[in-house]
Amino acid sequence: MSNIIVEHQYSHRLKLTVVRAENVTKGAFGDLLDTPDPYVELSVPTTPESRKRTRHINNDINPKWNETFEFILDPNQSNVLEVTLMDANYVMDETLGTAKYSLSKLKVAQMEHVTLSIGKTTKVFLDLLLEVCASTDLRFSMTLCDQEKLFMQTRRDRVMLSIKKLLKMENPRFLPSSPREVPTIAILGSGGGFRAMVGFSGVMKALYESGVFDCATYVAGLSGSTWYMSMLYSHPEFPAKGPGDINKELMNRVSNNPLKLLLPQNINRYVKALWKKKSAGQPVTFTDIFGMLIGETLIPGRMNIKLSSLKGKINEGQSPLPLFTCLHVKPDVSELMFADWVEFSPYEIGMAKYGTFMSPGLFGSKFFMGSVVKQYEENPLHFLMGVWGSAFSILFNRVLGVKETTSSSTMEEELEQIKPEHIVGDDSADNEEETQRGGTESADAEDERQRHAQASWVQRMLTSIMGDTTLFTTREGRAGKVHNFMLGLNLNSTLPFSPFSGITHQTSLEEEVDAVTDPDEFERIYEPLDVKSKKIHVVDSGLTFNLPYPLILRCQRGVDLIISFDFSARPSDSSPPFKELLLAEKWARMNKLPFPKIDSKVFDREGLKECYVFKPAKGDKNCPTIIHFVLANINFRNFKAPGVPRDSDKDIEFGDFDIFDEPASPYSTFNFKYNNQAFKRLHDLMEFNTLNNIEVIKEAIKDSILLRRENPARCSVSLSLSEIENKKFLKRDNSIAKRPT
């Protein structure tokens, strides 16, 4: 494994104690009418979460507070402390005076006792202590976190036994003789709404019952597949209870349309819950409500469960590590041109492009320069489910049936009708203080204002959802939004996903630029995130391509065999099934990641098959093998199980269906209700296709074992930072202060 540390800038922590004040006055005339009820407001405009205040003290001209506050400061900014003395009143609080103090005067680790004069007679006494932040709440590294490394070791021992069990009748030379020979296997599920979720449920049943699931180290999902993974891994009886039983629960849940949850009494409950989130200072969009709908449909008894709580399913290596994904996108830029992949696991959330990760409980909190300045509760799993599948909140008009369109139009065609600025907006000017009015109003007046604001916001949300759907044409209603956890960081350079970039042979220019669907695809993927934007937008990863390959192509994970299942929509059942895989290949090559050559002409030579195998070129020791399953009804029409023909009219009728060709197909990407027959057909089809190719999977596992044996240092990365050609994002600022030693 490599030990690559991504450079980041240090910050200062200011500890400020408001000690006391002397001779607080409202002026000669004001003092005759009333004795002040003073409190102090503090502000450092150059830092987030910059407004803080003491309690007020009644009728005291010499108040003593002794209250301590903290600010995270950028030492390269001209930071100025603004101190405002206030008088609390029943209606509107009164400003008594303001003083400023330049924080550049402070020296690290030296306490300063500061006296500020306000007016002619009033003094405010402060204690200021400046510290260097010795650690941050973000982890800056390309390596896997310690928890995942420990998981991999524990899981490897279990996988070794499981592979021996799966291949028990094989020649011993095909079995791993040591943990080093155990291949790392990843299972992938694509997006595709409930079609992907139901199809993946059949896949997982087959993999679980055949023993292949126990041989996998990772399960990665995107959009609809993440919904199934969320339901499976959050189930209290999983993994002791397998997908076979759990899928019956899923069938019952999807037999009712989740839109029935849009009854006024439910919506009112959702929106009021979201007001609490908004009033605490977190951004709220329609993705939050969509996540509630998906959660109430799939995990109704587990709405409070968190991503981090899924660690209990994997800590002993008893199940593959689940990986989920979304995209960070920019305003006014197509997701196909620019997108940063965000990965989620029960251990960490982050972006490998920047080597920046955090614990799941911190995602959504306010950060500055790598440190949390305001922490919120961990988001519930259903919120993340809404983010991971947010294409459907973006296209909710279509889901509702509000927009008239042809049933054959694809999600891509629908999204082309929506300009990027309607999905996301520029948040650089967002007012982070929108819910923090500080001391300008009395407590009673503030409470009344909050009640009116809540009522107004709830009414607007209800009207938008139940009425004219204006919510869907504004940036507020489109994409998920969270506080920017990279706010204030210094992106001088970034490390490529691949530690071999710039050292191995360069991909040919022709391979670099060949378009799969659009000449502009991935054109701007080397650009950096905007570290000045206070919030970032996070959307469905399927908006760039519909397979979560970036998660498991990280060289640190050392994946040998990828078993991917693509449930993406195609124009017809007979259409070539490689579009998403070709996009994944192009993305990998642009990031210098090992990826087998995808020969799309295999479709012309061999026709439509249940799965295709793509192997690395001879001598390529670090490239994974890919088994790519597609959504196709071929042998299932005639066989109810591998080798078992259909022998009754009822059986034959059950297996005789198309997925994309039928005009009234229940398998539309936008269908959120599956009757039992539609569910069983798709579920059983993908279970059959998987079981029908178990021998293909076994052969690939054997090949991976032999490759590991022949290349014991496979995927071992020991390159130093100086050996890697960094991609320059921004010119280095020579004025950046060096961290003191």
Curated annotation (Swiss-Prot):
Residues 406-453 are annotated as: Disordered. It comes from the Eukaryota. InterPro entries: Acyl_Trfase/lysoPLipase, C2_cPLA2, C2_dom, C2_domain_sf, LysoPLipase_cat_dom. Residues 132-729 form the PLA2c domain. Keywords: Calcium, Cytoplasm, Cytoplasmic vesicle, Hydrolase, Lipid degradation, Lipid metabolism, Metal-binding, Phosphoprotein. Disulfide bonds: none annotated. The keyword Nucleotidyltransferase does not apply. Residues 416-425 have a biased composition (Basic and acidic residues). Its EC number is 3.1.1.4, 3.1.1.5. It is found in: Cytoplasm; Cytoplasmic vesicle. It is an enzyme of class 3 (hydrolase). Gene3D superfamilies: C2 domain (2.60.40.150), Cytosolic phospholipase A2 catalytic domain (3.40.1090.10). Activated by phosphorylation on a serine residue. Ca(2+) 1 binds at D34, T35, D37, N59. Coiled coil: none annotated. One of its GO terms (biological process) is regulation of G1/S transition of mitotic cell cycle. Residues 1-172 are annotated as: Phospholipid binding. Stimulated by agonists such as ATP, EGF, thrombin and bradykinin as well as by cytosolic Ca(2+). Residues 1-116 form the C2 domain. Selectively hydrolyzes arachidonyl phospholipids in the sn-2 position releasing arachidonic acid. Together with its lysophospholipid activity, it is implicated in the initiation of the inflammatory response. The N-terminal C2 domain associates with lipid membranes upon calcium binding. It modulates enzyme activity by presenting the active site to its substrate in response to elevations of cytosolic Ca(2+). This is Cytosolic phospholipase A2. It comes from Danio rerio (Zebrafish). The gene is pla2g4a.
